[in-house]
Amino acid sequence: MLVRTALRLIFGSQHERDLKNLLPLLNAVNAQESWVLPLQESEFKQKTAEFKARAAAGEALDAFLPQAFALAREAARRVLGERPYDVQILGSLVLHHGKIVEMKTGEGKTLMSVAAAYLNSLSGRGVHIVTVNDYLAERDARWMRPVYDYLGVSVGVILSSMGSQERRCAYACDITYGTNNELGFDYLRDNMQFLTEEKTQRDFYFAIIDEIDSILIDEARTPLIISGPAENDTQHYAEVDRLVGQLQEVERNPATGDYPNEVDGEEVRGDYIVDEKNRKVSFSGPGMLHIQDVLTHAGLIQGSLFDEENFKYIHYFTQALRAHLLYRADVDYVVKDGQVQIVDEFTGRILEGRRYSDGLHQAIEAKEHIRIAQRNRTMATITFQNFFRMYKKLSGMTGTADTEALELNKIYKLEVVVLPTNLPVARVDEHDVVYLSEEEKWSAICDEIKEAHTRGQPVLVGTISIEKSEKLSALLRTRGVKHEVLNAKNHAREALIIAEAGAKGSVTIATNMAGRGTDIKLGGNPEFRARQSATAIASKHGSSSVTVQEHMQACYEAEYTRWRADYEEVKQLGGLYVIGTERHESRRIDNQLRGRSGRQGDPGRSKFFLSLDDDLMRIFGGERLKRFMSRVGMEPGEPITHSWLNKSIERAQTKVEARNFDVRKHLLEYDDVLNEQRSFIYAQRAQILIDEHVVERVYTTIEEYLNREITALRQELKRRGRLSLGAFQQNLSTLFDYALGGEDASGWNETRLGTLKQEILAHLKKNIESKYLLAGAQNMDTFIRYQYVQAIDKKWLDHLELLEILRESVYLRSYGQKNPLTEYKLEGFDLFYTMLDDIRLSIASQVVRVTVHMEEQRVPRPPHVAQAAHEFQALGQPGRGHGSLSALPIQAGAKVGRNTPCPCGSGKKYKHCCGR
């Protein structure tokens, strides 16, 4: 420790060294200012065209970086009236070099990204600026578009409401704003298209991720899923929900609070064990037998619970218990309009259309006694971890990344560089105060809020759930404190509430959704007030939005004058007072809450009020602390404040962060297996769509198949001295309608086997060539492509299910002293190679056996999988590693009957062709 401190004193911190290395580039940018100032607007566009031409000719972007950055800075000054500070230019240099910038709230991250985005757009390969929601994507694109227009680069924005053509145009722009969800779903949908021209995205070159910690860490365990309807087993969830109350939790040791160890032979009383930290439930031996008795008595099963047809009920009981014990209404989800809507644990926002995966959502619907929706089947999936690792260069910005620097470096190979604030941070972060009980804590918080409100200091209170925010709201109402509540239930008023959160005397209770991407200004927000005034004036006279803009300037001048006085008064009162009502699992989330106060050198204050009943304290040693504090004579209502307590809490948070990192890393190791397979299958699919000689793939497959079979026959001949052609003949007949004839094989040798292979291959090639003559090369190529794509899509869905089953069961291999991950990799790739062989051989078989009719036929477009990829309904849930974000394709067109002719044109019944 002393050595590290000494080295830091001598050489500076890593962040200081990183910034020092960039100073020559910053000086070079500043030196270009005299060159750029006299330029006319048209010359900016000329320079952009010149730089694009140089980049297209192979020149590195760094060759004209100083000039490009100087152009971007001057364009921002002329268009927005804001000249990026040197620290913002430093931040843009960090982004350009593929690193993460940590920049405090209110320091201008949106403007900082302009120079890096402009420079990299000159490559002609597209830059993606990624935000967490549509509102921020649209706002930032609208705000920065005039700057980019001045420079002569095009800007697009991807919104969830857009169709395919709009998306295609937006992705073709030099710079594209969009959300992480939309970019990920577009990637999956593109790989479900039948025609290359229907794809929307280009290759992944450079991305700048806003709030990068939220996307790459908080949502890292969130798989994006496009899904379709699966087996309808909704009645089982309702049946089990009625029975689950008959089960009892295993009794704990009253002295330690621990469960008995069944493996060591300790007596177990009860049916299930709850793992609150990991949100899991497991059953005891007696519990399994009790479930069997309950199901038998209810008439739902016959025989043993462990029979193949009954084993599924263990899954239904597991999810029912998780729904009742580990997922709470108004904390993890809300019930609205007859639907269970997920609440993001990190932002407090409702995650529109998302659903918990693996049947958990259905179990919660059964618990809440609302309509249970049918489960879905995964059709395409990718995690954010693997999606963003596809970019050639990745960077990002946030106010809180340094605490997660290790994870960001290990998983994404991204370094974090902390930028100094333009003005020193004047916020005072006080020690936590801890109370024995939750009720004592709430009482103290209310007293603190009322005191600050009385003197006029604005207060922002952060809560971890809707339930807690509404509880505090009720307590404040009884004390007569006027306040606003911002949570997922009233998120529509977010802009209004946040705009006034810094006004004199305001009290705002908010879940974590408060203000990521927005600033809380002391004294209120003059722009927002001016727009409200201008809108009111215009509507009073029945005027249009054009008239609103005409009134804006006058209204803004009046509001700005009032705001300056309010701002100075609130500064004198100490600025925004941030109160935390509970520590989060991650220090980073706590820092985000603190960061709402003290923007751009403003004064501020932050303080956390805790109790030993809080989740973090209770799970990580709260009972022991409570006994200790009682022994030292703490009186009810008396708080404890000490630096060692803060360190103890931070140690608990560090443990949780390390555990969550291990979980994400472990999941990534498993997902990397799927990612490698997905990359290969998508690449093959894309190549098939553009392959002008697709029939050669069929010829290769047939030849490889014959080589394998003939090799096996040669080995048999060597081993036995004679041949048995029965199985080979049966396979040829089944696959290719080919008969060997009646030749006696008793005298065959290896030479005859070689000529046999050539005879069969020549016959099958002639068969296919005759179809090309009859149907035409274009029609046959289209038919083969269609068969390939359909087979890939169908087999890939089956393969995803097999991998999921393997992943859920492979952990049992550890009991046999085997590494589950190694076993998963080995068996996963065995399944994958088997799938590839099945696809290739099934296509070769179909092409050989298809009948070509001498009439005009149009090969149809693929069925609903590809067509519906344009339209989807979002489903699925992120968070805690148990959810997924999904999109559900909508089936379009009439369903093909199993006994009707197959639409592919083979002449066979659908059930004997593509419907197999």
UniProtKB/Swiss-Prot annotation:
Record's subcellular location: Cell inner membrane; Cytoplasm
The EC number(s) this enzyme carries: 7.4.2.8
Enzyme class: translocase
Reaction(s) catalysed (UniProt annotation): ATP + H2O + cellular proteinSide 1 = ADP + phosphate + cellular proteinSide 2
Bilayer topology annotation: Peripheral membrane protein
Function description: Part of the Sec protein translocase complex. Interacts with the SecYEG preprotein conducting channel. Has a central role in coupling the hydrolysis of ATP to the transfer of proteins into and across the cell membrane, serving as an ATP-driven molecular motor driving the stepwise translocation of polypeptide chains across the membrane.
Residues that hold ATP according to the record: Q88, G106, E107, G108, K109, T110, D519
CDD domains recorded: DEXDc_SecA, SF2_C_secA
Superkingdom assignment: Bacteria
SMART domains: SecA_DEAD, SecA_PP_bind
Protein name: Protein translocase subunit SecA
Family per record: Belongs to the SecA family.
Cofactor comment text: May bind 1 zinc ion per subunit.
